[in-house]
Regions:
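Conserved ABC ATPase "signature" region
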Residues: 106, 110, 117-135
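Conserved ABC ATPase signature
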Residues: 139-143
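Conserved catalytic motifs of ABC-family nucleotide-binding domains
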Residues: 160
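Catalytic Walker B motif of ABC-type/P-loop ATPase nucleotide-binding domains
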Residues: 164-167
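Helical segment within the ABC ATPase nucleotide-binding domain
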Residues: 179-192
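ABC ATPase "signature
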Residues: 224-225
Length: 274
């Protein structure tokens, strides 16, 4: 799975991005770059602006102020080009329970104009990739929560995206199902070198998957860096929850505003899952 990898072109670029719903400021002057092949996380509580930010990146919301580029392409000027580069798993379930797993993925293959001669093999490939090949011909309504999430991953991967976007990919799942989804995401990211952008409020998820994270609170990025670097900068034994509280004055479910801090990584964080 590959996409635009031109030297010097970031996978995602946000410059001065601000978004309001009426008088309510939900994204506040965000600057951000994500490198090709990186797994990057937006970590923060509900209402932090994470989902709005990725909806701007995925063209699901109009950019009101600032600039959003995906592999150098402006989302406002060429939204259809950007959409062809993306695989997206939203928070809300995006499967049809009355169809089999295979039929669900096949529908997405047609939606993304996967060539007809390739569809059967491509669908089988991504179902096997997420360990659903043996359950592919069961109705999706019979799937567990973890299987549903893995099916959604297969749907998002069938067009071989350059950028995979995951909005709270394991919210509501039990620990076993959560670990299974984490393992599939890490395996696919490592195998194909695709860029992954995810939102989460689970610090364990950020630590398990992300090369770097941006801590978001009240629409703004409060700190940015590799999880290990952010923790080390605060002190031995610090967790990402501690880091978040330090920079924002709040917990991952709190709402008090903190200051901006940027901790740069000098190395890629080692994968915790493989």
């Amino acid at each position: 799975m590959s996409g635009p990898q031109d030297a010097g072109v970031d996978a995602i670029t946000l410059r001065g991005v601000t978004h309001r719903f009426g008088d309510h400021l939900v994204v506040d002057d965000v600057d951000l770059t994500v490198a090709p092949g990186e797994c990057f996380g937006l970590l923060g509580p509900n209402g932090a602006g994470k989902t709005t930010t990725i909806r701007l990146i995925t063209t699901l919301l109009p950019v009101q102020q600032g600039e959003v580029l995906v592999f150098g392409t402006d989302v406002r000027r060429k939204p259809m080009v950007v959409r062809r580069l993306l695989g997206y798993v939203p928070q809300q379930l995006s499967i049809e329970g009355a169809l089999t797993g295979r039929e669900n993925v096949s529908w997405f293959a047609r939606l993304f104009d996967v060539p007809r001669r390739e569809r059967k093999d491509r669908v089988a490939e991504v179902l096997a990739m997420v360990n659903l090949d043996e359950a592919a011909d069961r109705l999706a309504a019979t799937y567990s929560g973890g299987m549903v999430r893995r099916l959604e991953l297969a749907q998002a991967l069938v067009n071989r995206p350059a950028l995979l976007v995951l909005d709270e990919p394991t919210v509501g799942l039990d620990p076993v199902a959560r670990d299974s989804v984490w393992a599939r995401v890490a395996e696919m990211q490592q195998r194909y070198g695709m860029t992954v952008l995810l939102t989460t409020h689970y610090m364990e998820e950020a630590e398990a998957l992300c090369d770097r994270v941006a801590l978001m609170h009240q629409g703004a990025i409060q700190a940015l860096g590799a999880p290990a670097d952010l923790q080390a900068a605060l002190g031995p034994g610090s967790s990402l929850e501690d880091v978040f509280r330090h920079y924002t004055g709040s917990s991952l479910t709190g709402n008090e505003r903190g200051g901006l801090r940027d901790v740069r990584s000098t190395r890629r964080t080692a994968r915790r899952l493989g």
